[in-house]
Amino acid sequence: MQFSKFGEKFIQDSPILQLMDDLGSALNSDTPINMLGGGNPANIPEVSAAYEAALQQIAASGAAIESVSNYASPQGDAKFIKVLVEFFNRRYGWGLTSDHIVLTNGSQNAFFYLFNLFAGQFCDGSHKSILLPLAPEYVGYADVQVEGSHFVSLPPIIEKTTHEGHEGFFKYKVDFDALENLEELNNNQIGAICCSRPTNPTGNVLTDSEMAHLKQLAKKHGIPLIIDNAYGAPFPNIIHTGASLEWDDETILCFSLSKVGLPGVRTGIIIAHPKIAKAVSNMNAIVNLSPVRFGAAIATPLFENDEIIRLSDELISPFYKKQSAFAIRRLQEEFADYPVYIHQPEGAIFLWVWFEGLPISTTKLYQILKEQGTLIIPSEHFFVGMQTADYPHAKECIRLSIAQDDHTLDQGIKTIGEVVRQLYHN
């Protein structure tokens, strides 16, 4: 049997496939596994109870059965879109209309659309790429483009820092000197700029100043700035440093219901210029007919009365801040006298750990830890759009999920400590 080039692209091994396969294997395993590698959000009992109440409410009202027994338009559930318009205008005064919002079957679906809209071959014969202002970035971006992989990214400025008075931390910053002199940007070979904020995998939050600079660059070159806000404000608000949220017609904001604790409903939200929203809606019609409505049905009452804000601010964000503090303490206990650094824990549901001068790559470390019942994600695949052969830092980091209970975090970090200390000694 032969597949097309399109088919061959999507059946080959890829980092996101590895991540999801390992997640599935861990969830179905009879052997206890310290699952520090996946992107699944935590099960927070009080949050789950709120969703159960919302489910009961829509079941009693008939909204649940109505949502699964009828298609939405390709744009998405009309009632939820109306509620979202009111929600964002109430909080930010952006002057949105329903034409500015389109729903997708999760954020991954949204970025498949957006990255194929703004990168690849254009009608005039030119080829353009997506610019990621710094790597590492979300591994799920890497393989979504139909025609090859069209990404350009730059290594970050690495600044060693302190956190709450403690040494052993660092922060990534955008290298704007390199960015402004980037050949592809200045030769009209970039179709859009994209960043996640907070960043998956590092928890980095680009500062307001950095975001303003990126916006200015995008405007200068006549391209959109895409912001992946899956972990940001106002929901799930897993962000532990000051950061404002801005939008205009030249910005594309992407949200998700996944990290508020509803990954299974596969609901993504795009806020963009109506022309872009319409293009995504058309793609929905061809690829999916229409987005799934069930997530919209659950979420509608939570956005109508701002319950989603209470859940985010009072339960979700504090939970991850607590887990972050616990994991940091354990990592510093395990590596007190080793060249191990943690990225500033500014947000998201991960910690990014740098083993400076590690004798092996973290891809090999991943295999060793996997055999010992602990799953992490190695760093190399997160450097999307970058050549890493001569960049050792790209092979020295791991992503740890903090969406686990204390026992799993403790045992997983203990195993990592034992293995990595031995590697340094050898």
Predicted regions, residues:
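N-terminal "arm"/small-domain region of PLP-dependent enzymes with the aminotransferase-like
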Residues: 1-75, 86, 90, 221-223, ...
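PLP-dependent enzyme catalytic core of the Aspartate aminotransferase-like
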Residues: 78, 82, 86, 90, ...
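Short, conserved charged micro-motifs
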Residues: 359-365, 407-411
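Short, solvent-exposed loop/turn segments at secondary-structure junctions
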Residues: 39-43, 108-109, 137-140, 198-201, ...
